[in-house]
Amino acid sequence: MNAESSSQAQNVDHHEIAKFEAVASRWWDLEGEFKPLHRINPLRLNYILQRAGGIFDKTVLDVGCGGGILAESMAREGAQVTGLDMGAEPLQVARLHALESGVNVAYIQETVESHAQANPQRYDVVTCMEMLEHVPDPASVVRACAHLVKPGGHVFFSTINRNTKAWLMAVVGAEYILKMVPQGTHDHKKFIRPSELIGWVDGTPLREKHMIGLHYNPITDHFKLGRNVDVNYMVHTQHEG
């Protein structure tokens, strides 16, 4: 392994890993710290299903799978799902929950860069949700995802925009006022503008096909998808190699 590939294989922020390991046991508590993920998961899943033309019997990789919320839901749609994460505790929770639920998901503790080196063009669909803002080099993750998907396959990213509105809503509002997620979950400096993400995508065989925002209304306590990408957003890309 050369210096570049070694660096890519260690694209890990151990402080970020520790944050999620500390609360891993409550990953499937529908009223706990991960309640927002449980609530937005149907929106994310439906978006993936619609844009990818369904995932039944397709090979799917969930990068940064955590405790397996999205991975399990995709497996229930008939996909052959692999979940990738660097947190040992979240993966253990994911494996136990899959066993209890009777869902078949292969969970692996490995960086996406390392997985890409061994599995080029292996997957029909790759998802990378709420993960890019938690690693030192998000562009490296985008490149690895592009390497993992088959020509014609689909890659989905979701992250948080970097601007004052996003800081007020995703950090001040969600962490300190509404207490929807633990304080310190997000670092505004690590948020990613859509132009930055698309710039990284354009440096690969992936091409942007669609972008959509994810909105939360604190008055109605309701999540929905919409055109505004000021805060949370998802991007659908396709490998055109």
From Swiss-Prot:
Query: The organism sits in which domain of life?
Result: Bacteria
Under catalytic activity, the entry for this protein gives: a 3-demethylubiquinol + S-adenosyl-L-methionine = a ubiquinol + S-adenosyl-L-homocysteine + H(+); a 3-(all-trans-polyprenyl)benzene-1,2-diol + S-adenosyl-L-methionine = a 2-methoxy-6-(all-trans-polyprenyl)phenol + S-adenosyl-L-homocysteine + H(+)
* An MF annotation (GO) of this entry: 3-demethylubiquinol 3-O-methyltransferase activity
- EC number(s) reported in the record: 2.1.1.222, 2.1.1.64
Q: Does the keyword Transmembrane helix apply?
A: no
Q: Which UniProt keywords apply?
A: Methyltransferase, S-adenosyl-L-methionine, Transferase, Ubiquinone biosynthesis
Record pathway: Cofactor biosynthesis; ubiquinone biosynthesis
The record ties this protein, via Pfam families, to: Methyltransf_23
Q: Which InterPro entries match?
A: SAM-dependent_MTases_sf, UbiG_MeTrfase
Cite the binding residues for S-adenosyl-L-methionine.
44, 64, 85, 129
GO BP, sorted A to Z: methylation
For whether the record's keyword set contains Signal, the answer is no
Q: What does the UniProt record say this protein does?
A: O-methyltransferase that catalyzes the 2 O-methylation steps in the ubiquinone biosynthetic pathway.
User: Which NCBIfam families does the protein's record reference?
Assistant: UbiG
Give the similarity note: Belongs to the methyltransferase superfamily. UbiG/COQ3 family.
- PANTHER family per record: METHYLTRANSFERASE, UBIQUINONE BIOSYNTHESIS O-METHYLTRANSFERASE, MITOCHONDRIAL
The name of this protein is Ubiquinone biosynthesis O-methyltransferase
Q: Specify the species.
A: Serratia proteamaculans (strain 568)
Q: What is the lineage of its organism?
A: Bacteria, Pseudomonadati, Pseudomonadota, Gammaproteobacteria, Enterobacterales
> Which gene produces this protein?
ubiG
